[in-house]
């Protein structure tokens, strides 16, 4: 899980979602997991 100021899609499979007021990226590739913080 990467914590970043700006979360971006890294590939076509990445999805930008909101959970508990946090912007997150979920993907089939676990390296692409990010959350805003």
Swiss-Prot record:
GO terms for molecular function: structural constituent of ribosome. GO terms for cellular component: cytoplasm; ribonucleoprotein complex; ribosome. InterPro entries: Ribosomal_bL36, Ribosomal_bL36_sp. Belongs to the bacterial ribosomal protein bL36 family. It comes from Synechococcus sp. (strain CC9902). PANTHER family: 50S RIBOSOMAL PROTEIN L36, CHLOROPLASTIC, LARGE RIBOSOMAL SUBUNIT PROTEIN BL36C. Keywords: Ribonucleoprotein, Ribosomal protein. It comes from the Bacteria. Signal peptide: none annotated. This is Large ribosomal subunit protein bL36. GO terms for biological process: translation.
């Amino acid at each position: 899980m990467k914590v970043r100021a700006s979360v971006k899609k890294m590939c076509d499979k990445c999805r930008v979602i909101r959970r508990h007021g946090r912007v997150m990226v979920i993907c089939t590739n676990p390296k692409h997991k990010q959350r805003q913080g």
